[in-house]
Amino acid sequence: PGTMHEYKIYIPQEYDGKKPACLYFGLDGILYNAPVVMDSLITSGDMPITIGVFVQPGVIKDTNGNVIRYNRSNEFDRTDGTFAHSIETEILPAVESHKTADGKAILISKDPNDRAISGASSGGICSFVAAWFRPDLFSRVYTTCGTYVAMRGGNELPALVRKTEPQAIRFYIHDGSQDVWNPIFGHWYEYNLLMASALEFAGYELETKWDDGNHSIKNGSREFP
């Protein structure tokens, strides 16, 4: 209660407001130079007309408007469907309550096959968890250096994937061998490998990219197009 989120909306020039567009939902705001990439892909016809929603993690402010708590880990690293529920019931309805600069209604497809979610680090695991618990909302997931470590239970997800019938979700996972290590939480790169192995075992449609990068979106941005 009381948590505030800032978000930005990307509307491609090709959007006519007459039928629902696909959705790209980006965590931690605009990453990977996404609007520029989307402009290029939509114009070339390699990507359907897609509205981008870029959300910052929540903050709580005092009566003077000063931030007194950052809620990123509590929202993004949790391993249940809470944040996905917020996307469905709070964020997307707020987005669709707006109009474009030229007065068009913002219409977003309800088909999960038309929806992708992405993020890096804690945003990466949040993307995975949102689709995992709510495949009716998202069926495309793009993650880089995801925090699948022992922070808030993310380390248990690969075992859950192996033990559960596969769902209609497609995944892209990227990480680098120089990703961060923590003596309590573990090694980010190793847990990304474990997650990819579990998804492959369970029969998911999966694409991976491994390099020698660190805990950064630099290489993930390179791969994004």
Please describe what each predicted stretch is:
Residues 1-225:
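Non-catalytic cap/lid and distal C-terminal segments of serine-dependent acyl enzymes
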